[in-house]
Regions:
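Carbohydrate-binding surfaces of carbohydrate-active enzymes
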Residues: 2-12, 16-470
Length: 470
């Protein structure tokens, strides 16, 4: 009915909160055929392992089944929707997906959040409610901007501040927006403007940002600021210190059914998200990186190149399970002069062979000098009365592999004057290992200097930094 308006009038379609799996596990003949062709065995005798622990084989059947399921979702739903719009000169976009602020939620809704989001021409997320500065939807914003950077999109959008009340001020509006832009977003979308007075009767997510507000006469000042900022930050290539591996394989290996995950899966998410926020708020920017893009990367002079992106550190969050080719790529980065840092728990299993995979133990030994987290022994420096829990192994090619068995997400104060302790939070370890992109004068971290968030775009020969003081 509207074909004559495409694409001149209708330039795109923006989906809101698409439902796909809702925790359901797909079973179909086409999925079985796909699984058998890729993995060369019949999964049916092992499908009980999707719901119950069946030993070392558990991780293998879960990872391979969910990978095949996610691939078919991408080929039959996520990509065709994008292709349909592109063939008609339109953009396919989102500003709201389910599983908010949660790796586990993203997975049980979509199987693989990267396989879905990489087909949006504009990706994005919601950011509702009223918070203090520094309290916006960090994890969702960083995921949206990471997909934009990895898959070479121009825009990452936000649908913002609904539910914050009609009393939301312009001071709050600009502070929250600057924070989101520091996370890498670059397209502002307020939630709604209701022109009928009865609209507020049904509208449960105020404010309605338009002529009813006392700041309406000054609204153009805000939009000019956002327009300029959006125009600048939608250009060029993102520059960040760290590629933070998104631990999808570990999430798949610990997915039981619906929204149920093992305790180990909960730890993967909670510690992984805390790690991401801890390094960012300490002044170290990152992109979440999926297995596909990491395996496409090349290494040159200690730099990991993913297309035009460049990273000096690969950060492995706590993991139970990893793809063998992913760990081999990380090892190649280490041998090529790069810095690899693993935190809290080294993976013991692989997607290809399940738990206790000898190849994973071999690769970990070559990287960190230990085959598993349980084999780590820290060294007490008796001459300095200091305790360093960080283990570092160096390669002849200049690379370094660092294992932090129990990072501190908050500083501890030690009252014994005869005892000193190395600060083992991950941001301090990164800061000591590389020359950071952004530093504060006086040798302090950005968080110590005043909670300064930042993002960096390289636009041709120009370096553009956007800094936000929380």
């Amino acid at each position: 009915h509207l074909g004559r308006f495409v694409p001149d009038t209708l330039r795109g379609y923006l989906q809101d909160e698409i439902y796909v799996l809702g925790g359901n596990i797909v079973y179909a003949e086409s999925l079985l055929a796909r699984f058998q062709s890729e993995n060369e065995y019949d999964p049916r005798p092992h499908l009980v392992g999707l719901f119950h622990d069946i030993g070392d084989f558990t991780d293998k059947i879960r990872c391979e089944y969910y990978d095949a399921m996610s691939a078919l979702l991408e080929e039959n739903l996520y990509r065709p929707l994008s292709d349909w719009h592109e063939a008609r000169g339109m953009q396919f976009s989102t500003i709201a997906t389910w599983g908010r602020q949660s790796m586990l939620g993203q997975t049980y809704q979509y199987g693989d959040i990267f396989r879905m989001c990489r087909w949006f021409h504009i990706t994005g997320n919601e950011d509702p409610g009223h918070t203090e500065p520094g309290g916006r939807c960090f994890a969702d914003a960083k995921l949206s901007s990471s997909v934009q950077h990895l898959y070479e999109r121009d825009r990452a959008a936000m649908c913002v501040y609904w539910g914050s009340g009609h009393g939301m001020t312009q001071e709050e509006n600009i502070a929250w927006t600057n924070e989101n832009y520091a996370y890498g977003l670059n397209m502002y979308n307020t939630h709604g403007g209701l022109y009928g007075s009865l609209g507020s009767w049904y509208e449960w997510v105020p404010p309605s940002v338009h002529f009813r507000q006392p700041y309406w006469e000054h609204w153009n000042c805000f939009t000019q600021h956002v327009s300029r900022l959006s125009a600048i930050l939608s250009q060029g290539v993102h520059r960040a210190d760290v590629a933070l591996l998104y631990p999808l394989t570990s999430v798949h290996a610990n997915w039981l059914k619906g929204d149920h995950f093992t305790a180990a899966g909960d730890e993967v998410e909670m510690e992984g998200m805390a790690l991401a926020q801890q390094i960012y708020t300490s002044g170290i920017d990152f992109d979440f990186v999926d297995d596909l893009k990491l395996n496409e990367a090349t290494v040159n002079d200690g730099i990991l190149h993913i297309d035009e992106l460049e990273f000096r550190v690969v950060l492995m969050p706590p993991m139970t399970t990893i793809r063998t080719d992913t760990l081999e790529k990380i090892k190649a980065f280490y041998e090529g002069g790069g810095t690899v840092i693993a935190v809290s728990h080294l993976p013991g299993g692989s997607a290809e062979h399940g738990r206790n995979d000898p190849r994973i133990r071999e690769l970990l030994t070559e990287l960190f000098g230990i085959p598993a987290s349980s084999d780590y022994i820290h060294v007490v420096g008796r001459s300095t009365q200091g305790v360093s829990r960080v283990s570092t192994q160096r390669h002849a090619g200049g690379g370094q592999a660092i294992f932090i068995p129990q990072p501190e997400l908050h500083s501890n104060v030690w009252y014994d004057p005869g005892f000193s302790r190395t600060k083992d939070d991950t941001s301090s370890v990164i800061a000591a290992a590389i020359e950071r992109d952004v530093v504060a004068s006086g040798g302090v971290t950005l968080s110590e200097a005043g909670d300064i968030y930042h993002t960096h775009q390289r636009i041709d020969a120009l370096d553009v930094y956007f800094l936000y003081n929380v």
